[in-house]
A protein has these predicted regions:
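Signature for phosphate-centric chemistry
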Residues: 27-163, 167-337, 341-432
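Bacterial Sec-dependent N-terminal signal peptides
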Residues: 1-28
Length: 432
């Protein structure tokens, strides 16, 4: 696909010309005007990936801070970058074994042959790398770190101390390493303290109890799945020269197609070209996206059905953010607190902080129209809280989600996307 190169080009261009600074308010985090999820997926079929979608960097702007305010501290939480599958029996391994006899028999169509050859490539790239960060994931975090440094240079001019903490899971530790390596490349004088350990999991990756909090979600998702039966016939005509002959090689059409969808979603994380979407009708992979999109939001975000019970589970992470921000405001001399974790805690965090769009409260029927998982919880998704102070000691905070200025639903800003820290702190501490 034409996917990562334009993103990389955009990052290089932004680094070359600098970030746009104007007096605009925060960027709209919903769907572009006049477009919906189907439109976005037709533009780029890899957007069916949801939380397996690679990071999309878009050109952005910075609203000027009020006169006299200078950035002095950043509080950050980042999901690990692109990874291989975390389950056993990866889809591409299963499909390679299943399709090899048909490939050797010469009954695959040109689309089917292309798919098989890319499946073989995925097996080679992913061999011995289950659950691991990929080179794409390393690149994502290095680029995010570089942009953060160049965007807020004044933070790191005032202080060189950076604390980084990670989930104990390898892909998070390596994401932390990639991010901090890029920061050090920007400024070798930075004093970066990196650690991981079980003690940090209590807030970085705290999801205990979410199953009980969202009891009933399975029933809703099963009903939705039943109401949207999948076409498991059309792919035979696309992948085989003779669909009837192809059926003899496929034992379970539904599971075969499910594995094909997994390959379509994961190939981008492994840096393998996508040829899989062309082997399925649009409706098949769109409906698969919709089911996963609804599942992610319903179980881990601020849903109307379960949000009041699910979101408070993220309180330890919010407490850590507030405590470390208070210390920075009090003058502990730290430039940034960095945290590297997972998608589920980050989704709950956006709901707890009440971030506009990504953390909004929607009912099950609204999810696909309001919340696009492929943007909202893609690989390397991140939150950056940037703190500003004037000579009088007044502190403002700007929230960036995936590097874009983002508003708080339930709180009036001081100006543009800037909030008074004392008001924002109080709002977050009193939620739930």
């Amino acid at each position: 696909m034409k996917h990562y190169r334009p993103i990389l080009a955009a990052a290089i261009l932004s680094a070359a010309i600098g970030f746009h600074t104007n007096d605009s308010y925060a960027q709209n985090y919903g769907y572009p005007e006049g477009k919906n999820a189907a439109d976005l997926i037709r533009e780029d079929t890899l957007r069916t990936g949801n939380n397996h979608h690679i990071y999309e960097y878009v050109d952005l702007h910075d609203t000027r801070a009020p006169k006299g305010y200078k950035a002095f501290y950043i509080s950050h939480y980042g999901r690990h970058g692109s990874r291989t599958d975390h389950r056993g029996n990866e889809a591409w391994v299963v499909l390679e074994k299943e399709l090899r006899p048909a490939y050797e028999a010469g009954i695959l169509s040109w689309k089917g042959r292309q798919a098989y050859e890319k499946i073989v490539e995925m097996c080679e790239v992913g061999d011995g790398m289950r659950e691991m960060l990929t080179p794409v994931g390393v690149r994502e975090h290095k680029e995010i770190a570089g942009r953060m440094y160049r965007r807020f240079r004044e933070v790191f001019r005032q202080s060189k101390e950076v604390e980084a903490r990670s989930s104990t899971v390898q892909r998070c530790v390596l994401s932390m390493g990639a991010f901090c390596t890029a920061l050090a490349a920007e400024d070798p004088k930075l004093d970066i303290d990196l650690l991981t350990g079980q003690r940090y999991m209590d807030y970085i990756a705290h999801t205990t109890g979410y199953g009980e909090a969202t009891a009933g979600s399975d029933k809703m998702l099963k009903a939705y799945k039943k109401a949207h039966p999948r076409d498991t016939v059309s792919f035979f005509a696309l992948m085989f020269n003779d669909p009837a002959e192809g059926r003899a090689f496929i034992k379970d059409a539904y599971h075969f197609e499910s594995n094909l969808i997994d390959c379509a979603n994961y190939c981008q994380c492994l840096g393998v070209e996508d040829v899989f979407h062309r082997c399925m009708p649009f409706e098949v992979y769109y409906d698969a996206w919709s089911l996963k999109n609804r599942s992610l939001y319903l179980v881990h975000c601020n849903s109307a059905e379960f949000g009041d019970k699910r979101i408070p589970i993220g309180k330890p992470l919010v407490d850590d953010i507030i405590a470390k921000a208070d210390a920075a405001v009090a003058g502990n001399g730290r430039a940034a607190d960095l945290r590297f974790g997972h998608d589920y805690p980050l989704m709950a965090l956006t709901g707890y902080l009440d971030l506009q769009g990504v953390g909004g409260r929607y009912s099950f029927d609204e999810i696909d129209d309001k919340w696009f998982g492929s943007w909202n919880i893609c690989m390397a998704s991140n939150l950056q809280l940037v703190f500003y102070r004037n000579r009088s000691g007044d502190v403002l905070v700007k929230c960036l989600y995936n590097e874009r200025e983002t508003l708080i639903n339930g709180l009036e800003p001081f100006y543009g996307p800037y909030y008074r820290w004392d008001e924002l702190r109080k709002y977050w501490m009193e939620r739930f």
